[in-house]
Regions:
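Exoplasmic/lumenal regions adjacent to the first transmembrane segment
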Residues: 1-221, 226, 233-269, 273, ...
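Kinked, hydrophobic transmembrane alpha-helices enriched for aromatic residues
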Residues: 17-21, 214-252, 259-281, 308-327, ...
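Interfacial loop-to-helix transition and helix-capping segments at the boundaries
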Residues: 148-162, 188, 214-220, 256-269, ...
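Hydrophobic alpha-helical transmembrane segments
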Residues: 158-159, 373, 397-401, 504, ...
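Hydrophobic core of alpha-helical transmembrane segments in multi-pass integral membrane proteins
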Residues: 160-174, 322, 404-415, 470-485, ...
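Structural signal for the C-terminal ends of transmembrane alpha-helices
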Residues: 171-178, 281-288, 387-393, 447-456, ...
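Solvent-exposed interhelical
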Residues: 379-405, 450-466
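Alpha-helical transmembrane segments of multi-pass integral membrane proteins
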Residues: 437, 441-447, 466-594, 611-617, ...
Length: 630
């Protein structure tokens, strides 16, 4: 009986201690009112507390549902579990009438630093707490109330934009179905502008795959595998948080080299940079034999098409992150999502311009969008090389070699002059830096030119050369993955790895593409060219945009501590991928496809105007312009 009474006494003390700390910290940490960037209604948080009746209500809480929904001692403390979340939804749903008073639930989470102590003698009515000798310091408090997500300007803009898209989609789909099935009219003869928002037409176009002459089919598999690898890597990173109840197990699992590939997804970004550079040259050399001066005369179209092609989906995901995604779910860790909502409301323009990897890198609106900013920046400077590639063979090789030498030299000098010891410096000044990521892009341009000059040729490569190339590619790939695992105590080796690792990975990817195109891919080409990859490759850009928000929603909406294991990791990865595919498909049908059609119609109209103007000029006039599509 003595032990039972002792345990009950300790539970009472812990519960009262938690409640008093929650209320006290809440009172002493009011945010400034009137801030336009708040994501929660802190004015509501302030108004619900009546200090005069607080002490009386505290005495009544033990007999209410608060006791059941509140903090419990964490289970598994020896495996690094240090958080007890209580019951988030039960806590917020509490609304009880006790002795003529209405008590509503408020969810509070307090972070404490057990290494420091402080006596809170100023706390009113807590002599019982001081007598126990309990001392602590509060590091931070997170508090939530029911209905504390106010509608802001971003929400109203999102409602207006997506309501307009919905109306246009309904009207366009109705027109399309009426023309196709009621009037039995050939779609070619119907108005393309009126049916550009049609769900029927856009879905049919998205799911129809036809063979195209000169297409590199193996790229579909590479794109799909790369986006899955990126989602998996971000799933692993998202699972490393204070709500993971067995972080010790996490570090044990990833202390093994065999599991290093799970968190090496950053190499997939270099794969995308390789593909971007490769397709830039491969398509530019293939479209109507574009000349050097035509590129310069139409450089504004070159830049504009790149921006317009990526802008609709990018603007869509930024607007959703700043508004709709904040309201689709909720949980004990929703501050994880709210932080990104706040950043997107403040710094949305850095993602759209795009300068996200340069301006304010510590408060990025969806931090994974740095890749898109970098890709556009590389396309902006690419004409410095592309101009020479569009000339003779000699000028093309000279331009490509100079471009590769310049990018490698710049990356190497930059890595040797800087120290990336801290995680912040490594991410901001190395991982998301355009200078260090440029070499794979230029390597892709080189192999794009090689594929172009060998288009339609039947190359004969000795078996030993192909075997040696495969061996070198696989060895290099494994080395690049292993480099991320190893801790380099030699500063020279560390800087050399930083300078050339991404380039080595890019060469390995390009070799696989090359042998697949020229007929030496074998089972690798068969696997990468399977039709099952085509759909995911087609929506891979949208998947890259949406997967981060999906992961934020999953881990932000947790209500119990997350138990990490490889099995649970892959379950979360599978669900995140499924939700991402659904969101991406819907966005491609409702946003990307209509905008793509509108861009083509506008470009077609501009081209027709240019042709008409040229036809009206004398015969000695300059030849007509050819617009570049990349």
């Amino acid at each position: 009986m003595g032990n039972i009474k002792c345990q009950q006494l300790m539970c009472d003390i812990l519960f009262k201690y938690f409640v008093i700390l929650s209320v006290t910290k809440f009172v002493s940490s009011w945010p400034k009112a009137g801030s336009p960037s708040r994501v929660f209604d802190y004015e509501l948080h302030r108004n619900v507390l009546d200090p005069v009746r607080c002490q009386q209500q505290l005495r009544d809480m033990r007999t209410s549902e608060f006791s059941d929904a509140s903090f419990q001692v964490p289970q598994g403390i020896l495996t690094s579990s240090s958080v007890g979340l209580g019951n988030f939804h039960q806590c917020l749903s509490i609304k009880q009438h006790v002795k003529g008073k209405t008590i509503e639930g408020k969810f509070c989470m307090i972070s404490t630093n057990i290494k420091e102590t402080k006596t809170m003698s100023w706390l009113t009515g807590t002599s019982w707490l001081l007598e126990t000798g309990v001392k602590s310091i509060i590091d931070g408090v997170k508090q939530r109330l029911r209905g504390d997500k106010p509608l802001v300007a971003a929400d109203y803009i999102a409602i207006a934009v997506f309501l307009l898209i919905g109306i246009l989609t309904l009207m366009s789909t109705t027109y399309d179905i009426w023309q196709r099935f009621l009037r039995k009219k050939d779609p070619v003869n119907s108005n393309e502008l009126l049916r550009c928002f049609s769900v029927y037409t856009n879905t049919h176009r998205l799911l129809t795959f036809s063979a195209t002459s000169g297409a590199i089919d193996c790229i579909d598999g590479i794109r799909s595998i790369s986006i899955l690898w990126i989602i998996l890597g971000h799933t692993v990173i998202a699972s490393i948080n204070k709500y993971t109840m067995n972080l010790f197990d996490f570090f044990v699992i990833f202390d093994q080299r065999t599991n290093m590939w799970l968190i090496s997804g950053e190499l997939a970004v270099d794969t995308y940079l390789v593909l971007s550079g490769l397709l830039l040259v491969y398509t530019s050399k293939s479209i109507k034999k574009i000349k050097q001066m035509q590129l310069l005369k139409n450089i504004h179209v070159f830049y504009l098409q790149r921006l317009l092609r990526m802008f609709p989906l990018l603007g869509c995901v930024v607007l959703l992150q700043a508004s709709v995604f904040h309201h689709i779910s909720d949980g004990a860790n929703w501050h994880y999502m709210a932080e990104n909502v706040l950043f997107c409301r403040r710094y949305w323009w850095t993602a759209l311009l795009p300068v996200l990897n340069i301006v304010n890198p510590t408060q990025q609106c969806l931090s994974h969008l740095w890749y898109l900013s970098m890709d556009v920046q590389l396309h902006v400077i690419s004409p410095l090389v592309l101009f020479w590639v569009l000339g003779s063979s000699r000028s093309a090789w000279n331009g490509l070699i100079v471009g590769l030498t310049t990018s490698l030299t710049a990356a190497t000098v930059y890595c040797f002059l800087n120290d990336f010891t801290s995680e912040y410096d490594n991410h901001v000044y190395y991982h998301t830096n355009t200078m260090t990521r440029a070499p794979p892009f230029v390597i892709g341009m080189i192999f794009g030119y090689i594929l172009h000059i060998n288009r339609g040729r039947k190359l004969r490569i000795p078996f030993w050369s192909v075997s040696l190339g495969y061996l070198a590619a696989w060895a290099t790939s494994l080395y690049c993955i292993d480099v991320l695992y190893l801790t380099w105590h030699d500063e020279l080796l560390d800087k050399l790895n930083r300078s050339f690792m991404k380039s080595l990975w890019g060469v390995s990817v390009c070799w696989i593409i090359f042998v697949c195109v020229v007929g030496y891919g074998g089972p690798i080409n068969w696997f990468l060219s399977l039709k099952l990859w085509k759909f995911m490759a087609r929506i891979s850009y949208a998947m890259y945009l949406f997967h981060y928000s999906v992961l934020y929603s999953i881990f932000g909406g947790i209500v119990t501590p997350f138990y990490f294991s490889l099995e649970s990791l892959f379950l979360v990865f599978a669900s995140a991928t499924a939700y991402t595919v659904i969101c991406s498909t819907a966005a491609c049908i409702l946003v990307d496809a209509p905008c793509s059609t509108l861009q083509k119609l506008i470009l077609k109209a501009l081209t027709s105007t240019a042709k008409s103007a040229t036809a009206e000029k004398p015969a000695a006039a300059s030849p007509q312009k050819e617009y570049i599509v990349v």
